[in-house]
Amino acid sequence: MNWFVEGLMYVLSTVGALLPIVNPLSAVGLVMSITADLTDDERTDQIRRACIYMFCILTAFLVAGGLIMNFFGISIPGLRIAGGMIVSYLGFRMLFPDTVAISMQERAEASAKADISFTPLAMPSLSGPGSIAVIIGMSTTVQTGTHIVLGYVQVAIGIAITAFISYIVLRAATKLDKVLGAVGMNAMSRIMGFLLICIGIQFVINGVLGVVHGA
């Protein structure tokens, strides 16, 4: 029973680390703007495919994370520090927004595309640099454990749950936009930004401690 509880906690920790970074609420406005000319069924299809692409992208980096780090000679503490800086930067941009994540030109190009599920929805909106950095970090953590295959499966389940939550949120984009409004969406985005800063700073602290202990 203990192994089940430990596995469940690992899955939930994966969701807890990924969800604030993926932040599907921040993509609601993008979905509403670039799918304005689509029917509900077409919008749902694009959202579903985007979330599937997100799962595939992050799972690919989960599997290849160790290979990438070994190829470039990146240490785990170094990855944690770099990932923490990226996550903190994304958090600061959400907490103190001064520029739009996607320019008007990119929005216009996306609106003109027949398929917007891969870009800009799946990448970079849902699976951007921050979430990729976190997944690569989890990949290296799994490889240092005793049950590598089980660890990969647990993280993959966490990614799948995050993708499903993102699908539910984006599927309800129209209702969320009406209920929360611009002010509510902005407030939620700032809260997520603060959480990202906390997560990023903790990544940096863990990375620095790893360097100190390894010296």
Task: Explain the meaning of each model-derived region.
Residues 1-20, 97, 104-122:
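Small-residue-enriched transmembrane helix starts and helix-helix packing motifs
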Residues 1-15, 70-81, 144-158, 212-215:
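Interfacial loop-to-helix junctions that mark the boundaries of transmembrane helices
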Residues 10-62:
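Juxtamembrane transmembrane-helix termini in multi-pass membrane transport proteins
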Residues 19, 28-34, 119-124, 132-144:
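Generic transmembrane alpha-helix signature in multi-pass membrane proteins
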Residues 39, 60-83, 165-210:
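Transmembrane-helix boundary and interhelical-loop signature of multi-pass inner-membrane proteins
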Residues 39-52, 146-157, 186:
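Membrane-interface alpha-helices at helix entry/exit sites of multi-pass transporters
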Residues 44-98:
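Membrane helix-loop-helix hairpins that form the core translocation module of multi-pass transporters
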Residues 86-107, 199-210:
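Transmembrane helix exit motif
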